Amino acid sequence: MLDLAYLQTAPEQTALLKQQATDFIVREELGYPLSGDGEFAAVKIRKTNANTIWAGEQLAKFCGISVRNMSYAGLKDRNAITDQWFSLHMPGKPTPDFSRFRIEGIEILEVTRHNRKIRTGSLQGNHFDILLRNADATEELNRRLNLVKRLGFPNYFTEQRFGRDGHNLTEAMRWAKGEIQVKDRKKRSFYLSAARGEVFNLVVSDRLQMGLATQVMPNDILQLAGSHSWFQANEKEDLNALQVRLEHHDILLTAPLIGDPPQSANALENQVVAQHQALLTLMKREHLKPARRPLLMRAQNLNWQFEPTGLRLQFFLPAGSYATALIRELVRVVD
């Protein structure tokens, strides 16, 4: 992350993040109603300084089912207070009495039934309430806040995607080069995600360095706002008209989540992607289809206020975007 470009320049001001669990609060928004009946117990919890997988294991143990029958929509930060849903596959079994559930760091908020598994990625997004300690109301920081509100921030994958000390990315590279075999299904998923995240970040950073993060280029692959539909800015498209649509947030620039067959986009992107042949071969071997991801992301309902202890941010991000990528554009987080 240190070498990736900024939409603006590197921030001047420093701040402290996650000094206390209350400094980083996340509320998950599934975006769909739960059915109230079905084979799955659906449990909404509030966890404090606990990781998602461990919390899910405790729920599965309480229900007397295998951890394989537990699922969730997304991994949440450990050093935080986070609200999220879990589904527990219990066909033909009654919902346990969760008022008897007693595990430090986990509070049961809501219990119901659902007719489907809550799958990874099956959420609308997350609400954030974050305190950046020691951040002062300088002219520079206010300017950054207003620019992030207007233009957005580079939609980078951050450290969570790559594992501790980049372990998942390191292993993905070794796997791609044939140095290791990976049989564990979860590890395969983590490593493939890290590999795609790395190439995406490099494409975005390269484009930012060229000053083209808000400019439609020939052969760009563009996303219709609010959808997962893409189209290409080929010779049939009017680039000036597309530029106007981009500025009105009707369409979004995208960067690749590599897969097979490879996508041909603008020349700048193609050049970066071509430097990662081993990863492209891995994607082909694993039958991973290509996808796109917005190059910039605008936080919804972004609000802020300066408090005696620092800067408080409140905003909503769609699933898959990282609050730490937004914060990176505002301040340098120090230990």
UniProtKB/Swiss-Prot annotation:
Pfam families listed in its UniProt record: TruD (PF01142)
Domain TRUD: 152-308
Active site, per annotation: 77
GO molecular function: RNA binding; tRNA pseudouridine(13) synthase activity
EC number(s) recorded for this UniProt protein: 5.4.99.27
One GO process term, biological-process aspect: tRNA pseudouridine synthesis
Enzyme class at the top of the EC tree: isomerase
Record has Disulfide bond as a keyword: no
Catalytic activity: uridine(13) in tRNA = pseudouridine(13) in tRNA
GO cellular component, one term: cytosol
Record-linked PANTHER family: TRNA PSEUDOURIDINE SYNTHASE D
Function: Responsible for synthesis of pseudouridine from uracil-13 in transfer RNAs.
HAMAP family: TruD
Family assignment from sequence similarity: Belongs to the pseudouridine synthase TruD family.
UniProt-recorded name of the protein: tRNA pseudouridine synthase D
Gene name of the record: truD
